[in-house]
Structures are given as C-alpha cells and as structure tokens.
Regions:
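N-terminal glycine-/serine-/threonine-rich phosphate-binding loop
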Residues: 1-32
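Glycine-rich N-terminal segment of FAD-binding domains in flavoprotein oxidoreductases
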Residues: 26-51
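Glycine-rich beta-strand-to-loop/alpha-helix junction loops that act as flexible
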Residues: 34-39, 132-136, 187
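A glycine- and small-aliphatic-rich helix-loop capping segment at beta-alpha/alpha-beta transitions
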Residues: 46-56, 81, 145-153, 201
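Ligand-binding beta-strand-loop-alpha-helix segment within the catalytic cores
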Residues: 56-131
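A short secondary-structure junction signal
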Residues: 111-112, 141-146, 194-198
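Class I SAM-dependent methyltransferase SAM-binding "motif I" and its flanking Rossmann-like core
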Residues: 130-174
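ATP/nucleoside-binding phosphotransfer catalytic cores, i.e., glycine-rich phosphate-binding loops
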Residues: 180-232
Length: 232
C-alpha cells in the first residue's frame, strides 16, 4: 500500500485542493472523478473558499462521479447534490464541465445515457484522477464485496446496496483501473481495522473491492488521517 498519512482529515483535503490548483493550470481539460461520503464534503467546502476558489482555473476541470444513488439532486443522498450545494453554487464553472449521473432518471435509461456520455467525452476511457472513498465493509464507489464483477467490460453498472437495497449507478472496476491516478481518501478510526487487514493480506485473499482495484498503468495511493492509520 502506497500510503500518505496526514495529521487530520482537513490536512488531507488541503493537499488534494492544492493539487486541484496544479491540475487546473495545465493547458488542457482534466477529468477528475469525485467520491461521496463525509470527508469529500470537507474537500468541497475547502475548495469553495479562498484561496482555492480563486486560484483554480475551473474551466479546465471536468467533474465526474465514481457512483451516485438513483435519487434527484435535491435529495440529501445525492452525491452530485452535495457537491452542488457545497462547491458549484459558490464558483464559476461551465455547465458542460459537470458530468453527473442523473439519479432522477430510470436506472437502465440512465446507465445507457451515462455510458454514452463517458464514451463521447473520454473516448480512451482514461481519467486523469479518480478520488475514491472506502466503506468499513471494503466497498468503493458502489462496488460491494461479493457482488462486484471485476471483469465487467462495460463502463458503468447498476448496483444495489447489499443491506438497504438502494439502487445506484457506479463506474465499473475496469474503467476505474484505467485511470492515470487513483487516490483513496480514507479517514477516521472506524477504518483502522480494515486498513490494517488490507495492508497485511494479499488482495486476492480479500473480498474487498477497495483492496483489489488499483490503477493498471498509473499510480494508486491512499491518503489517510492519523486516526485511520493508527494500526499501520
């Protein structure tokens, strides 16, 4: 595991925000995939304020999501809705740079539409940067243990939460693995045990998608806070 440990979650998101500035200064579109969850909320809040809101050249950044729940953007469960509320409402970014999963649509229709958008905008399927979280069950995006097909050649998949049955759309493992860079942003003491297990056990012996999904031709790194890393 390629880990970087920060004193707090805020330190970790500040590092990511600084990297957004650098990516935005490249003279070409940069495709970044965002994650849901509590730590990314901290990231979006940080990006919406000085100095980052002013320093980032937003027109060069294109935003996507690793997954989203099939709910309208106004629903508190919507990953896109969280970013809109905490970040997009506070900055100037071209509407065409935001590539959301339309959770208000019928899932099969939206799966097809989203895959078509992915193919049209990123024909080679290679994201510049995919930021992922990890649940205490080892899931990432909406790819859950014991139900993820790691060989699925599609770009996206309809997934069902194993407990709630809630329907989501997620990027597939294969699409994620094509990225130039994957960063798992994992914070909090509740993740310490599973991180220890991932660090000490070969991925093929674990059911956790977060342990298995790595950039095939790029960099995979784990940004942790001290609480999450306490057993490493």
């Amino acid at each position: 595991m390629n880990t970087i440990t920060f004193p707090t979650a805020q330190h970790a998101v500040e590092k990511i925000a600084q990297e957004f500035v650098i990516y935005s200064q490249l003279n070409h579109p940069v495709h970044i995939s965002l994650s849901g969850g509590s730590t990314p909320k901290l990231l979006f809040k940080t990006l919406a304020k000085a100095p980052y809101a002013e320093q980032i050249n937003w027109k060069n950044l294109h935003f996507w999501w690793g997954d989203d729940r099939m709910v309208p953007p106004t629903d508190s469960e919507s990953n896109y809705g969280e970013v809109q509320k905490r970040l997009f409402d506070h900055i100037q970014i071209p509407a065409e740079n935001i590539h959301r999963i339309r959770g208000e649509n019928e899932p099969h229709f939206e799966l097809k539409r989203f895959e078509e958008e992915l193919s049209a905008v990123i024909p080679n399927g290679i994201f510049d940067w995919i930021i992922l979280g990890m649940g205490t069950d080892g899931h990432t995006a909406s790819l859950f243990p014991h139900q993820t097909n790691f060989d699925d050649e599609n770009l996206a998949v309809i997934a069902k939460h194993p407990e709630s049955g809630q329907i989501r759309i997620s990027k597939t493992a294969k699409l994620i693995e094509q990225a130039k860079r994957i960063t798992y942003l994992v914070t909090g003491e509740s993740k310490a045990d599973i991180l220890k297990e991932i660090q000490t056990t070969p991925a093929e012996n674990l059911p956790y998608p977060a342990a298995k999904i790595k950039a095939k031709n790029g960099v995979t790194e784990w940004y942790l806070d001290k609480a999450a890393a306490k057993l490493l």
